[in-house]
Swiss-Prot record:
Keywords: ATP-binding, Chaperone, Cytoplasm, Nucleotide-binding, Stress response. One of its GO terms (cellular component) is cytoplasm. One of its GO terms (molecular function) is ATP-dependent protein folding chaperone. Residues 560-632 are annotated as: C. This is Chaperone protein HtpG. Residues 1-339 are annotated as: A. Pfam families: HATPase_c_3, HSP90. It comes from Burkholderia cenocepacia (strain HI2424). The lineage of its organism: Bacteria, Pseudomonadati, Pseudomonadota, Betaproteobacteria, Burkholderiales. PANTHER family: HEAT SHOCK PROTEIN 90 FAMILY MEMBER. Molecular chaperone. Has ATPase activity. Belongs to the heat shock protein 90 family. Homodimer. InterPro entries: HATPase_C_sf, Heat_shock_protein_90_CS, HSP90_C, Hsp90_fam, Hsp90_N, Ribosomal_Su5_D2-typ_SF.
Length: 632
């Protein structure tokens, strides 16, 4: 096949500019990324080799070899993994196939440490070679293809690259970096080994380099024709916990999660019994950019008897734990396991149950930490993944109680929007005669905190949970009680504070009788806008509020459904009025502007709970007219 020159995809040009000009101070990452890619190529060969053993071509010992040539000023990274065909080389090295290209560029922060980590996360690590090289040559042959179908790809990291057909006996890929001026410090065994041991010690493949020894005559270190393994070269999860340092766990996490930050916590154990497997699970410190995308692929890396099977085995974890990263290595699953088999396998169901329990135990340890560092970690976790965890109440009935104990909310107990109150905390502070856990839902913490529905609760010193996450209304349809105490909305149905409001009830009944004619006329004036108008004792400072009937959808949920473009059933709220408020006391059912006052009280109540007016212009006109009549 003839020599061919092709242009990079536009995003690649932008990326190359970033690599060369923005990440220089963190240049060591080039080796981390290229070794990681070589490891992935070996994993892919193992997986495809399960179905076709001939792909190994009588060379079953997989390895990565790193070399350098001082005279030529080159570094080579060579693997005998799956390799690439011509089309794959163009697709993998000339374009960014992933849909997250735009997100990649919007995530760049200018912090070189963080930006360097994003490179791996977005699958563009190959281009990091241009940080230290002004030309990269890739020679590759895909396993199973004849020697004359190998490919040479070459680029100087500018606008284009060349593709040539070559002969290559060895399957796999050899990447040659032609170093830029000033990068000669990398042409040293000691330097390259230190980078490998820093970033890639956990790679399960042996990483080989030629041995080096002192030559007395030359007075320098010289390379020998003998290889040595420069990394641990064993799957980290197969080692005993006592043999793995925290730093090694952290490096391994950063490798599999493509994350620059340390994990919040991890757990590592071997399970024996009905199913035998090893699990190594990590909780990240921050959410990935695409956690809420519909096509987000969570899941764990699945190995069977140390053979890599797949990257994102979603069947091993429920959806609400999709943020958990890690590895499961099963001793029981067949090596030819497919996603279809995973869905039906009893062994997988047993593993899923065990992994879920272990992940929840990990979160419980964080949540119950007594020390400040542990508390801070759970706060970080909740900020990143709290909304995802709430999904578990509807998804995982068996573990619902455990999940409920992990939930955190803002509340009226503190004047802050921090979600740090557990349901157990709330119950421990309940009044002796209080029988329910009270909550209010709203779009924002400010709206929830200032809701008129809270007035009587403040007066009585009763704590109310302030729920402002979009998932909360859905969550509440599964969370009906905690510790035997039912959850109750302060904006739904008749408010019953038990013995806490006996006096108010008597006063309410008396006041209700006194203004009964006004209440009846208000219902007439508002018509179908409301289901009912009634006197309330839940207000102390506001003249009116809206509440939903016990079996009706809340106003907040209606607004949320409409915002999502869904049809929300038309609901009639109940208008409650405060008979002690000066505005209500002055209502005259026989006055000409009585209807305007009724609509004003309704509209005010709707606005106070974060609702939208159907006709803002009429509201303004009506308000102005009433103000003018009062002024006159």
């Amino acid at each position: 096949m003839a020599h061919e020159t092709m242009s990079f995809q536009a995003e690649v040009k932008q990326l190359l500019h970033l690599m060369i000009h923005s990440l220089y101070s963190n240049k060591e990452i080039f080796l981390r990324e290229l070794v990681s890619n070589a490891s992935d190529a070996a994993d892919k060969l193992r997986f495809e080799g399960l179905a076709d053993n001939a792909l190994y071509e009588n060379d079953p010992n997989l390895r990565i070899r790193i070399g350098y040539d001082k005279a030529a000023r080159t570094i080579t990274i060579d693997d005998n993994g799956i390799g690439m065909s011509r089309d794959e080389a163009i697709a993998n090295l000339g374009t960014i196939a992933r849909s997250g290209t735009k997100e990649f560029f919007t995530k760049l922060s200018g912090d070189q440490q963080k930006d360097a980590a994003l490179i791996g996360q977005f699958g563009v690590g190959f281009y990091s070679g241009f940080i230290v090289a002004d030309k990269i040559t890739v020679e590759t042959r895909r396993a199973g293809l004849p020697a004359n179908e190998a490919v040479r790809w070459e680029s100087a990291g500018e606008g284009d690259f060349t593709i040539d057909a070559i002969e290559r006996a060895q399957r796999g890929t050899t990447i040659t970096l032609h170093l830029r001026e000033g990068e000669d410090d990398l042409l040293s065994s000691h330097r390259l080994k230190s980078i490998i041991q820093k970033y890639s010690d956990h790679i399960a493949l042996p990483i080989l380099m030629r041995k080096e020894e002192w030559d007395q005559e030359k007075g320098e270190m010289v390379l020998k024709d003998e290889d040595e393994t420069v990394n641990q070269a064993s799957a980290l999860w197969t080692r005993s916990k006592s043999d793995v340092t925290d730093e090694q766990y952290t490096q391994f996490y950063q490798h599999i999660a493509h994350d620059h930050q340390d994990p919040l916590t991890w757990t590592h154990n071997r399970v024996e019994g009905r199913s035998e497997y090893t699990q190594l699970l990590f909780v990240p410190a921050h959410a990935p950019f695409d956690l809420w995308n519909r096509d987000y692929r969570g899941g764990l890396k699945l190995y069977v008897k140390r053979v890599f099977i797949m990257d994102d085995a979603e069947q091993l974890l429920p959806q609400y734990l999709r943020f958990v990263k890690g590895v499961v290595d099963s001793a029981d699953l067949p090596l030819n396991v497919s996603r279809e088999i995973l869905q039906e396998s009893r062994d997988v169901k047993a593993i899923r149950e065990g992994v879920t329990k272990r992940a929840l135990s990990m979160l419980e340890e964080l949540a119950n930490a007594e020390d400040d560092a542990g508390k801070e970690k759970y706060k970080t976790f909740w900020g990143a993944f709290g909304q995802v965890l709430k999904e578990g109440l509807g998804e995982d009935h068996a573990n619902r109680e455990r999940i409920a104990k992990l939930l955190r909310f803002a509340s009226t107990h503190g004047d802050t929007d921090a979600q740090d109150v557990s349901l157990a905390d709330y119950v421990s502070r309940m009044k002796p005669e209080q029988s329910k856990i009270y909550y209010v839902t709203a779009d924002t913490w400010q709206a929830a905190k200032n809701s008129p529905h809270l007035e009587v609760f403040r007066k009585k010193g009763v704590e109310v949970l302030l729920l402002t996450d979009r998932v909360d209304e859905w969550m509440l349809s599964f969370l009906h009680e905690f510790d035997g105490k039912p959850l109750a909305s302060v904006a739904r149905g008749d408010l019953d504070l038990g013995e806490l409001n006996d006096e108010e009830k008597k006063a309410q009944e008396q006041a209700g009788e006194a203004i009964k004619p006004v209440v009846e006329k208000m219902k007439e004036a508002l018509g179908d806008k409301v289901k009912e108008v009634r006197v309330t004792f839940r207000l102390t400072d506001s003249p009116s509020c809206l509440v939903a009937d016990d079996n009706d959808m809340s106003g907040y949920l209606q607004r949320m459904l409409k915002a999502a473009g869904q049809n929300a059933p038309a609901m009639q709220p109940i208008l409650e009025i405060n008979p002690e408020h000066a505005l209500v006391k002055q209502l005259n059912a026989d006055s000409a502007d009585f209807g305007d006052w009724c609509h004003l009280l309704f509209d005010q109540a709707l606005l106070a709970e974060g609702g939208m007016l159907d006709d803002p212009a009429s509201f303004v006109k009506r308000t102005n007219a009433l103000l003018l009549s009062r002024a006159a």
